[in-house]
Amino acid sequence: MTRRAATVTRTTTETAISLSLTVDGKGEVSVTTGHGFTDHMLTLLGFWAGFDLTLTCNGDTHVDAHHTVEDAGLCLGQAFAQALGDRKGIARVGNARVPMDEALTEVDLDISGRPYLVYRGDELLPPVIAGDEADLWREFFKSFANGARINLHISLLYGKNGHHLLESAFKGLGLALRRAAACEREALLSTKGSLD
């Protein structure tokens, strides 16, 4: 199998990001964004996906974490799409239900080439998590889905603790990505012959 890897850089007035990704890795992850909770969530995602991931971001966290989180999601999604290449042979669809203490999240996705996000249950999250508004994480998932060109459904099913809910979501996303990216065949899994 061809090595499925990509490197992405992005520099704006808000963030400077450097990212390298190997899809079929060993779960070796190094993330430094200047926002500890983001580092924690992206480390979980990469580990559970089995990615080798190195991501550094110098963002305008003196404002808040919004641009850092949003751009990290976009770059990670772009790297994932690039690493998969023509997507021939992948399972394409993946899902996972992951508990974290009292919280349970379900993640379902399709590497369809048609970006879309459904994010349900976010009313369970407290208004502020790790010093930032809870809606910040919707922006991450939206940016990731757009960059990766995937149809992504995340359902926070139940739970009380915002950290636990998000941790189960990021672990679930990683596991669902691992399953969807698995090579199971030679042909492209599409009756129309295209994933766009």
Swiss-Prot record:
Catalytic reaction list: D-erythro-1-(imidazol-4-yl)glycerol 3-phosphate = 3-(imidazol-4-yl)-2-oxopropyl phosphate + H2O
Gene3D superfamilies associated with the record: Imidazole glycerol phosphate dehydratase, domain 1 (3.30.230.40)
Domain of life, source organism: Bacteria
Main location: cytoplasm
Disulfide bonds: none
Pfam families, A to Z: IGPD (PF00475)
Enzyme Commission number: 4.2.1.19
Keyword set, alphabetical order: Amino-acid biosynthesis, Cytoplasm, Histidine biosynthesis, Lyase
Keyword rRNA-binding: no
Enzyme class: lyase
Compartments where located: Cytoplasm
A GO cellular component entry from the record: cytoplasm
Pathway: Amino-acid biosynthesis; L-histidine biosynthesis; L-histidine from 5-phospho-alpha-D-ribose 1-diphosphate: step 6/9
GO-annotated molecular function: imidazoleglycerol-phosphate dehydratase activity
PANTHER family registered for this protein in UniProt: IMIDAZOLEGLYCEROL-PHOSPHATE DEHYDRATASE, IMIDAZOLEGLYCEROL-PHOSPHATE DEHYDRATASE HIS7
HAMAP family: HisB (MF_00076)
NCBIfam families from the UniProt entry: PRK00951.2-1, PRK00951.2-4
Full protein name: Imidazoleglycerol-phosphate dehydratase
